[in-house]
Amino acid sequence: IAAIKVHTHASSAHRTLGEVLAIVHKADAPPAVIAQAERIFNRIAKAEEAVHGTHHIHFHEVGADDAIADVIGSCMAVHLLSPGRILSLPIALGTGMMTCAHGTYPVPAPATAELLSSGRLLAMSGEHAGEQLTPTGAAILSEISEGIPSLPAGYIQKTGYGAGSRDDPKSPNVLRAFLMECSGMSEDIVDILETNVDDVTGECIGTTLGRMMEEGARDACAIPVLMKKGRPG
C-alpha cells in the first residue's frame, strides 16, 4: 500500500516537559496548532506522573524528535482539514510484553493505559502481538478524537495512509484515515432506562411517567410483574 512516511534526524535525548514544549513553541505553525500540541504533551506528562508517582519526569521515547514531529504534524493536519468531528474506531492495543526505558511491561504500556482512562476512546486487544498503540498515539487520539464502535453511514471523499517504521510481513504497518461527508445521514440513537420498583403507589408511578414524557422521553410505560414474596410491582 502506498503511504506517506515522515523521516526525521531523530534525537534520542531524554527531555523534560519544559524542554519539549520549548521545541514545540519554536515550530513554524499557527498558534492553534502550538496550543493543541502543548495540550497533548501535557496529557502525556500527567499520565507519566500518575504512573511513576512523581512530578519530576523525563520523556524518553515520547521526547524524541520523531514523537514531537508526530504530535505537531497531527495537529497541523487537523488545523488544515478542519473537520467537524474526528472519530476513532476501536483501537488495537496489541498483546504480549514490551520493553521500554523503564523495563519490560505487559502491553499496553502503563502510560498508554493511563491515557486511555480518559474514557474517550474504545480499545481492544487486536490480532497482532507486540505494542500497537504508543503513549504518543494514545495522547494524540485522546485529544483530537472520540471513540465509536463502528463506522457511521456516510460518503467517503478521500482516504489517506501514513506509514510506520516497523516492517510486518503479515500486515501493512499503516494508519488509515477517511475524510467523510455524513451531513444529512440519519443516525438515531436511543437510550433505554429500565428499573424495578415494588414499594411505590400507582399514583406515584403515573406521575413519574407523565413527568418523563414532559422532560422529553420518546415513550414511557409501566409493566406489572410479580416480585419477591408474591408482591406485585
Give the positions of each predicted feature.
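Glycine-rich nucleotide/cofactor/substrate-binding loop typically near the N-terminus or early
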Residues: 1-52, 109, 118-122, 128-138, ...
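Divalent metal-coordination and catalytic microenvironments
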Residues: 6, 66, 141, 212
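Generic secondary-structure signature for well-ordered alpha-helical cores
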Residues: 11, 25, 29, 42-53, ...
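Flexible, glycine/charged-enriched surface loops at secondary-structure junctions
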Residues: 31-37, 50-59, 85-88, 121-132, ...
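Conserved phosphate/anionic-ligand binding catalytic regions in large, soluble enzymes, centered on
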Residues: 59-82
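Active-site glycine- and acidic-residue-rich loops that bind
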Residues: 68, 131-135, 199-203
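Mobile "lid/hinge" segments at catalytic clefts and subdomain interfaces of large enzymes
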Residues: 83-183
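A glycine- and small/hydrophobic-rich beta-loop-beta segment
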Residues: 172-233
